[in-house]
Amino acid sequence: MCLQHGLSVQKCAMAQQRIIDNTRMYFIASPYEEKNLNHHAYSYKDTGILKMTGIGRYDGLVNNDQKQILITPTWRMYNAMPVTTSEGEQRSYNPEFKTTVYYRIYNDLINNQKLIETAKRTGYAIKYLLHPILSAQVDDYTPDPYVEVISSVGDMSYEKILTESSLMVTDYSGVQFDFAYMKKPLVYFHPDELPAHYDDGGFFYDTMGFGEICTTSDMLVDTLCEYMENGCKMKPKYIERVDDFYHYDDHNNCQRIYDEIMKFQQQVDRDKLRK
């Protein structure tokens, strides 16, 4: 049974494939996941394995806005050390990290005085959350004292920081889908100097993304300041995209997953009796 930590809307057949994984049930939240996973590379089409239930952890995503801006980009293969433990966990410290364009762009952002002064004046905190794989680099950042840089390991709660944030800035991180589920505004930062993290799959940011796409730091800061000046409300255009993307938004996902598992187990039991 597959309970994903993210949504399968990008090309990921190298990591997920029914025959290799021996998957019997795959729980999904969006018709766009279903469309992507029905590609022949995954071997799910016409198997009945894909179950449109919603994602269980989304049941706990209830908005608890504490007036904070969350900046949380994903990682890049070239700025992390090779994997030595489980994939997805914090990797060893990379002594070359501070020489990367990735570091320069984001360290500059968390020192941008226009952004910080607007946040102060409008009453928003700013938090920069590292991807778990890059959390060993936390002390490399030199933020303005107003900005809190957070390592996403240990007792850090994603649910807490997502529900308490007013707006999210990300590039390609899968937590965008958690945040959008609460219909809170997102802004994408896709600087030309940084290559995309994923190949195109079933999610296209220009037509399906849940917020504006900014390609320069100045554009990003201007957009964030505008949102803060106007109370950080998701725009109707993007609310429509959220409604189109998710099959359910009723916080009953765990119950549907449980029901599907019980149906599967009952069928297994019946099959045993026939033998």
What are these regions (language model features)?
Residues 46-47, 140-145, 174-246:
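Catalytic binding pocket for nucleotide-activated donors in carbohydrate/polymer assembly enzymes
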Residues 51, 56-142, 214, 249, ...:
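Conserved catalytic-core segment of nucleotide-activated headgroup transferases in glycan assembly
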Residues 1-8, 87-97, 184-195:
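A short, gly/pro- and small-residue-rich
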